[in-house]
């Protein structure tokens, strides 16, 4: 039989080729044995399309030989290998880690190549009795969340260390109103046990004992004024052994100036401090007035105007009194008489006057050592009294007198 050859083209490529040497016999189609003529049967069949055969040829596909099967298996393996090679590798992406105001911090994160199909295959291999439902959160996700929580805590702790409060002032919760909390700033008390010991030591002084025993009406030395004395000791900053009787009366006099307006009662402090010598009281008042002007910042600015005011006052006096010109010659004589009067005073009076000057100087230094802070809050007074509530001094309450 003549040899036939057919070629088919599809999409510009050769898709198959059929070459037959002879017409197949119906018996040869059923078995892959060799033909009786001794020539082997050769055929090449395309997998996608078969060409038409000659008339009288069976259109059923011939039996595939063992070599074709091996070729088909090899082709399937070769097709699977490029699929494995072309599997998408995990890519690296940039994700937003945190937002800081208008700045955005990016973090490089590797995209996981785990797909839901992998979870299904894993669940199918589990032993019976194990829940095959896919977990909602993987172990890697939990680790990521734990790391994220730790990073947030560390970021929150850093500003707290920077915004730490000063030791002198603290904020305490005063009251709670529903979801709102009212905060009140309270100054930490600087009173130490050493100041209480110095105060108790001065109470044993005989002059101070007589003074406290005399003040039965508690006009000058009630428990709040005495607590202010301890507060002034703490603010002055002197060593505990340095506080003497004069410091006690200075602090008590200053406390009366802040809380009381009774000038007559404060005069008794001078009586017990200087005993019967009252010649020093007017000078003490003068020094106290000068101290008040020295504490006022406006008074310090106006001190430069004092000579000008004196000059204008003298000019006004001369314009109203025509005899002032004649009396001007008597000024040196008046100064001479004043000096003689001072010399006629006894030595004790001159000594007391020098002591008063020293007292005023010490009082000024004592007030400056407190940084000019003479006001004491009621909370601080209560803390001072709570240090030793059984002390006999705290029983000096004016409410018990009525």
UniProtKB/Swiss-Prot annotation:
It comes from the Eukaryota. Residues 1-89 are annotated as: Disordered. GO terms for molecular function: protein kinase binding. Residues 76-89 have a biased composition (Acidic residues). Residues 16-39 have a biased composition (Polar residues). Belongs to the Speedy/Ringo family. PANTHER family: WBSCR19-LIKE PROTEIN. This is Speedy protein E6. The gene is SPDYE6.
